Amino acid sequence: MSEQETRGANEAIDFNDELRNRREKLAALRQQGVAFPNDFRRDHTSDQLHEEFDAKDNQELESLNIEVSVAGRMMTRRIMGKASFVTLQDVGGRIQLYVARDSLPEGVYNDQFKKWDLGDIIGARGTLFKTQTGELSIHCTELRLLTKALRPLPDKFHGLQDQEVRYRQRYLDLIANDKSRQTFVVRSKILAAIRQFMVARGFMEVETPMMQVIPGGASARPFITHHNALDLDMYLRIAPELYLKRLVVGGFERVFEINRNFRNEGISVRHNPEFTMMELYMAYADYHDLIELTESLFRTLAQEVLGTTKVTYGEHVFDFGKPFEKLTMREAIKKYRPETDMADLDNFDAAKALAESIGITVEKSWGLGRIVTEIFDEVAEAHLIQPTFITEYPAEVSPLARRNDVNPEITDRFEFFIGGREIGNGFSELNDAEDQAERFQEQVNAKAAGDDEAMFYDEDYVTALEYGLPPTAGLGIGIDRMIMLFTNSHTIRDVILFPAMRPQK
């Protein structure tokens, strides 16, 4: 057996011994009838204590004689004979406990406290003071074991480093890694700030079906499920768009939804099959209004959540306080591939040849508009680092967007890019029922030709349009990618609490 194998075997034995030891301690607690008490109440969290009392010196704290109670997980413990220091971690952060034998009821220190393990959840009551190094601490007069941890924590010095374990056992990641906890705190704050931003502008939050008979609103491969009672195949939604626009037809002129979408596609650092989107629809507006709203939203979120309009992502700094760049799709192609003959983008055969020359495999079902879009994706998208709006998307790849009045081959649509990736997609909505019916039929034809991401024909949505959809603009923003930017996270798995993972064998 190699040295590495021997070390691994010894670690497994040590781990099993620790599990056995902890279970024996729990068994003893059960016999005493105090295994999982539920009568301890705290009056402060660690962050509340630091915020209120960090500025006070020890003399002032002693004169105030402030008694507090806290509860949380024991992360570290230094036993020094008759006294110990404990690091307690709770939802707000960490606070130090000073545990002295003579300050506790008889027997608690030696017979109970010293037998507890790291990871145990405890309650503590005592008075505030500061150590000689100036650290705010609690001099404990009462200690309670609230939950016995049967498994040891990850490496207490280096945190949890194994990426697979971090994602599969997110609870361990949250215990061990401050950055992970902060990422999801920021996520929650951003979602709350988005809702506040939208409601302040007269939008109503709504909920639309997650299971749909006809999946629509995006070009993507759906998940299929079966409704037993109805004996009906249904689809997990790929987007809420068509239902939200039905609500605008019904008279709700400003609506938004923050919820999950599901797409049966690949997994990557940018893609998870289950992801969060915000979609909004605003009557009597066009895509220019949404460009202004998007800029304002990102500026507001940065200021309110991070306290600055400058956001650092990797080696880049984005200043949301400045106007965002705006380019048409063709301008972006020319900017990032200057040798492009723009006339080639007006001819199918020339565009096809150009696409193939830069490594794009052109599918039989693609028209000129799809080819031009793929060329843009290949030559320009990765260069769109600073906040940029790309406009004038071809009608072929925009089956729900309003055609441009001057050039009907393009639409009044934009996509919003930051850090070389798409963050949002918005457009003036197509509200011509006959045009929509024709485009749905084109999608049906594309699906028949082999495009499994083409849309289904939604007859009821066409019927809704026949009752009249007012001039409307719609916007979708990928919340997960937004959170990646605001938390400087470089894989989508870092911002989704429980990302999709292949089952362990």
Curated annotation (Swiss-Prot):
Mg(2+) 1 binds at E415, E422. It catalyses: tRNA(Lys) + L-lysine + ATP = L-lysyl-tRNA(Lys) + AMP + diphosphate. The keyword Protein biosynthesis applies. It is found in: Cytoplasm. There are two lysyl-tRNA ligases in E.coli: lysS is expressed constitutively, while lysU is heat inducible. It comes from the Bacteria. The modification N6-acetyllysine is found at K114, K156. It holds the Pfam family tRNA-synt_2. CDD domains: LysRS_core (cd00775), LysRS_N (cd04322). GO terms for cellular component: cytoplasm; cytosol; membrane. It is an enzyme of class 6 (ligase). Belongs to the class-II aminoacyl-tRNA synthetase family. This is Lysine--tRNA ligase, heat inducible. Gene3D superfamilies: Bira Bifunctional Protein, Domain 2, Nucleic acid-binding proteins. Keywords: Acetylation, Aminoacyl-tRNA synthetase, ATP-binding, Cytoplasm, Ligase, Magnesium, Metal-binding, Nucleotide-binding, Protein biosynthesis. Mg(2+) 2 binds at E422. The keyword Ligase applies. Its cofactor is Mg(2+). The gene is lysU. Can also synthesize a number of adenyl dinucleotides (in particular AppppA). These dinucleotides have been proposed to act as modulators of the heat-shock response and stress response. One of its GO terms (biological process) is cellular response to heat. Binds 3 Mg(2+) ions per subunit. The third one is coordinated by ATP. Transmembrane segments: none annotated. Homodimer. Its EC number is 6.1.1.6.
